[in-house]
Amino acid sequence: MKKHLIATTLIASFFTLASAEEIMVSAAASLTNAFTDIAKNYEKAHPEDKVMLNFAGSGALLQQMENGAPVDIFASADQVTMDKAIEKKLVKADTRKTFVQNTLVVIVSTDSKLDPKNLEDLTKADVTKIALANPASVPVGRYTKNVLEAAKLWQTLEPKFIETESVRQSLAYVAQNETDTGFVYGTDAAVLKKEVRVAFTVPTEQPITYPIALTTDSKKGSDRFYDYIFNADSQKILEDYGFTKPE
């Protein structure tokens, strides 16, 4: 009887290990805190799986996938980057879902004497350095450029821009007083409430929405974490970090 129980346990352990997965997730930098918490909860619920998180600007993540980086799930901070991923057949189009929405804001450090109220205020002489993520590869930079071009302020402000590789780098620059102001997402500003404050929210022509999808090479068990993103607990975590449901 004892030998039978041992054999049964070994067989069960074998099948658990056989179904275990190391799930590789590449996600926009602004999802860092929320996805880290969600992954921790997921691993508690699915101890057989290990979630590996990779955060960067959405364009940089896309390039990594093009270069052959192993990725199972891709979450970008804009629809344009996901469109490109689909065009290049890097993700499964039928798994694409928009799962959260964000806002664009201008921030200053909490000890700054600056108090800009609108985009025009950024043209004033006392604002000399503005952190802006690279519009060519980072969605927040692209959203910002579109807004400033529509307001006919891009060329005026361009000499003040200090280019960064991600929204989190822009956040750090302002928090450390390396720049006077910066364009980030509302959720990023909320992460460092003691170091930065929101000067004003920037209206965008289109809502800032985030899509997620399984990659074409995703492992069989990856859909477990993909589905987990949409459960009530995970959605509550995203909400707690300031994300809202898509309109």
Language-model region placement:
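Exposed boundary/loop context
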Residues: S13, K50-M52
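Gram-negative bacterial Sec-dependent N-terminal signal peptides
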Residues: M1-S19
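Exported/periplasmic ABC-transporter solute-binding proteins
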Residues: A20-A45, M52-F55, G59, Q63-N67, ...
